[in-house]
Regions:
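Intracellular juxtamembrane helix-capping segments at the cytosolic ends
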Residues: 45, 124-138, 146
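Hydrophobic core of transmembrane alpha-helices in multi-pass small-molecule transporters
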Residues: 27-28, 97, 108-125
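Symmetry-related core transmembrane helices of the 12-TM Major Facilitator Superfamily/SLC fold
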Residues: 175-194
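C-terminal ends and interior cores of transmembrane alpha-helices
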Residues: 92-106
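Helix-to-loop junctions at the C-terminal end of transmembrane segments
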Residues: 69-83
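Residue-level signature of mid-helix packing/kink "hotspots" within the transmembrane helices
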Residues: 36, 64-72, 157-158
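Glycine-rich segments within core transmembrane alpha-helices of 12-TM secondary carriers
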Residues: 139-161
Length: 215
């Protein structure tokens, strides 16, 4: 029992940067940001372009359609290049594509294309990418580590909603898209760049990574 406790402390001593960067990456990724902010953005978009609420929220449906198509590609890229490269690239492109909403001109077609781009480029920020590395770092405290990683969804869902409302009220919806979209690039990306690393080499299974790390 004491040995397991010591191993658990050792895991967190080594792996807490991965957990922290995963929490930020998930919390500022595709899972929460578009879905928690679309309701706040809908009213100013209706006022600006005369769109219906149903037309605006259809963007969420597009995201739900694109993600299942993009997920196998993300999985292949993660196997080929490693989850670190996939996560960092996806954070950067997701941030840019989300900020691109600020340039909406009233074309619903382009608005929907933007939603598709957000889903496509942001698929690598979904929890499966981050939790793969967390899963490989932890054994004894794996459940706790995964739980802490997923904590970011709720935390940044709340913070993102408040921040979006504040930006809309003080600077308008275009600035809100830029401000919220910049969060992954300015917060999650730098932390992940320095702290998010997978165990072992690219293309290894989780068991192989543990063996190579212990050798």
């Amino acid at each position: 029992m004491q040995d397991q406790t010591a191993r658990g402390y050792g895991e967190f001593a080594k792996g807490w940067p991965v957990v922290f960067s995963a929490m930020l990456g998930i919390g500022l990724g595709l899972s929460p940001l578009p879905f928690y902010t679309v309701g706040l953005m809908a009213k100013p978009l209706v006022k600006a372009f005369g769109w219906g609420y149903g037309q605006i929220f259809f963007g969420v449906t597009i995201t739900s359609m694109v993600v299942p198509l993009a997920s196998p590609v993300i999985g292949f890229l993660a196997e080929r290049f490693g989850v670190r490269r996939v996560a960092l690239t996806s954070l950067f492109l997701f941030s840019l594509s989300f900020m691109a909403f600020a340039f909406s001109s009233g074309s619903l077609a382009l608005f929907y294309v933007n939603w598709a781009a957000v889903a496509l480029f942001g698929a690598g920020t979904l929890p499966i990418t981050w939790t793969r590395a967390v899963n490989n770092y932890f054994d004894v405290r794996k459940g706790l580590a995964l739980g802490l990683s997923l904590l970011g969804t709720g935390v940044f869902g709340y913070v993102g909603t408040w921040f979006t409302a504040w930006l809309i009220e003080h600077y308008g919806w275009r600035a809100a898209y830029v401000g919220v979209g910049a969060l992954p690039m300015l917060i999650a990306l730098p932390v992940a760049f320095f702290a998010f690393h997978d165990v072992g080499g690219v293309g290894q299974t989780g068991a192989e990574r543990k063996v190579s790390d212990a050798a």
